[in-house]
């Protein structure tokens, strides 16, 4: 009598979880092995100090890679001075401490003026440090970005950074599975950023809480790796710690030839495994959300939460449109903070600053998209500052080889050095109170880009068009 093998269909998340499960605990949590640990200057100092105080060494040196990004200056003159060019004392100390700790613990680092330096979530995939099938963590909430490569990736806190350094493992509770499927074809001028903003508008910033989100459907099948990274990057803004896309030929072609990617026989073996990294037919999802690509237009956030977003052709919503009292109260506060009126057309919002960059939209595809809009045109007179900040030294280098820097500079943009920049008020790139900024970043919370600053989340193409007009415009007709 032959044995009968019953194979249960699994989601991608389940496959990755099971492949890295070390042990299950009585309290319902599990011990998970971590393949790649990305470090930066803000959440690592206390972790390294904890290691030193306990007289421990990192468990697996090769699994760790560091680069400064949050606090680094983006102005070239200051950048050329290295760490000493950082004006803020605390920021300077954090970057210096990262350098010192990496030397002390023998951890590889792309230092401030290494051409490979950049935003950690741009550098990881770009260098082939993040590969399909990996578990990836970093002391930063936008680590979900790496899920675009078919990884289980999420942010961790400082105490967890120390735990991973010391043990290469992490105690976690398993999430539920959510599938977000977008079928159809995106219209001209509609990008990955618009897709993820539309998703957040639909499910809300708490919609993905407790879930690992897998993005699937024709839109993602046809989307570039850069676009997939943009979408997975903002899974956290939808409430989920994890966002991911199954592996396909687009993934494998992106990874091929990267500096730290496998080669030869190891490459062939890796590809064979990577091709299994997709959800099985019939796999169970605890929640399924569907969108039609033809319904998605260029998006603009109007308020102080990523879910406060509408099509550029629409208006600031009125209180009468609020679904409940809680939402109405949040909208009222947002009207006041943002200096906007109910029913105000989005295209009437005048802008003071433009920021093209961040771990969401600072890759070469993003810069090409923005450059195609501004070519031969000039930034509007009412825009005080428009800056472009590449996500890494290598993205910047490639953009310069393609002549994109000249297009931006001729239009009136500033061409900056790589870093997190104006995404968050932790470096010299900040908004002044009451300034409106069209930003390609991921969060529009109160004070996110500077005390009293007013952030509007958009795609690179929409930000570029807004810079030229001095207010929001529909890039499809610009």
From Swiss-Prot:
It comes from Psychrobacter sp. (strain PRwf-1). It is an enzyme of class 4 (lyase). It holds the Pfam family Aconitase. This is 3-isopropylmalate dehydratase large subunit. The keyword Iron-sulfur applies. Heterodimer of LeuC and LeuD. One of its GO terms (molecular function) is 3-isopropylmalate dehydratase activity. Catalyzes the isomerization between 2-isopropylmalate and 3-isopropylmalate, via the formation of 2-isopropylmaleate. Belongs to the aconitase/IPM isomerase family. LeuC type 1 subfamily. HAMAP family: LeuC_type1. Signal peptide: none annotated. PANTHER family: 3-ISOPROPYLMALATE DEHYDRATASE (PTHR43822:SF9), HOMOACONITASE, MITOCHONDRIAL-RELATED (PTHR43822). Pathway: Amino-acid biosynthesis; L-leucine biosynthesis; L-leucine from 3-methyl-2-oxobutanoate: step 2/4.
């Amino acid at each position: 009598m032959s044995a009968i093998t019953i194979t249960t269909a699994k989601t991608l998340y389940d496959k990755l979880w099971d492949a890295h499960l070390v042990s299950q605990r009585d309290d319902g949590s599990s011990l998970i092995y971590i393949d790649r640990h990305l470090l930066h200057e803000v959440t690592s100092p206390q972790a390294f100090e904890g290691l030193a105080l306990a007289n421990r060494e990192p468990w697996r040196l090769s699994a760790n890679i560091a680069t400064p990004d949050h606090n680094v200056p983006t102005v070239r003159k200051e950048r050329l001075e290295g760490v000493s060019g950082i004006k803020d004392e605390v920021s300077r100390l954090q970057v210096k401490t990262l350098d010192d700790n990496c030397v002390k613990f023998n951890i590889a680092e792309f230092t401030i003026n290494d051409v490979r330096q950049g935003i950690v979530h741009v550098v990881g995939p770009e260098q082939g440090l993040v590969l399909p099938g990996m578990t990836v963590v970093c002391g930063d909430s936008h680590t979900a970005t790496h899920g675009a490569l078919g990884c289980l990736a999420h942010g961790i806190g400082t105490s967890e950074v120390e735990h991973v350094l010391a043990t290469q493992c992490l105690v976690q509770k398993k999430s539920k599975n959510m599938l977000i499927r977008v079928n159809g074809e995106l219209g001209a001028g509609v990008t990955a950023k618009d897709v993820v903003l539309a998703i957040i508008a639909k499910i809300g910033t708490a919609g993905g809480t407790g879930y690992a989100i897998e993005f699937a459907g024709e839109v993602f099948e046809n989307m570039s790796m850069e676009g997939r990274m943009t979408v997975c990057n903002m899974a956290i803004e939808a409430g989920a710690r994890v966002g991911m896309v199954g592996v396909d030929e687009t993934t494998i072609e992106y990874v091929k030839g990267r500096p730290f990617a496998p080669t030869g026989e190891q490459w062939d073996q890796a590809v064979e495994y990577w091709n299994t990294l997709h959800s099985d037919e019939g796999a169970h999802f605890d929640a399924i959300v569907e969108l039609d690509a033809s319904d998605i237009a260029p998006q603009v956030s109007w308020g102080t939460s990523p879910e406060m977003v509408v099509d550029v052709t629409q208006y600031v919503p009125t209180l009468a449109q609020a679904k409940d009292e809680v939402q109405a109260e949040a909208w009222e506060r947002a009207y006041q903070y943002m200096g906007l009126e109910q029913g105000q057309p989005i295209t009437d919002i005048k802008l003071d600053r433009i920021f093209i960059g961040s771990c969401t939209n600072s890759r070469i595809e993003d810069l090409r998209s923005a450059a195609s809009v501004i070519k031969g045109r000039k930034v509007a007179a009412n825009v005080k500052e428009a800056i472009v900040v590449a996500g890494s030294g290598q993205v910047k280098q490639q953009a310069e080889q393609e002549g994109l820097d000249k297009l931006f500079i001729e239009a009136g943009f500033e061409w900056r050095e790589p870093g997190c920049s104006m995404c968050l008020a932790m470096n010299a790139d900040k908004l002044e109170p009451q300034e409106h900024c069209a930003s390609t970043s991921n969060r529009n919370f109160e004070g996110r880009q500077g005390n009293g600053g007013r952030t509007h989340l958009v795609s690179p193409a929409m930000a570029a068009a807004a810079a030229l007009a001095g207010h929001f415009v529909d890039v499809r007709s610009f």
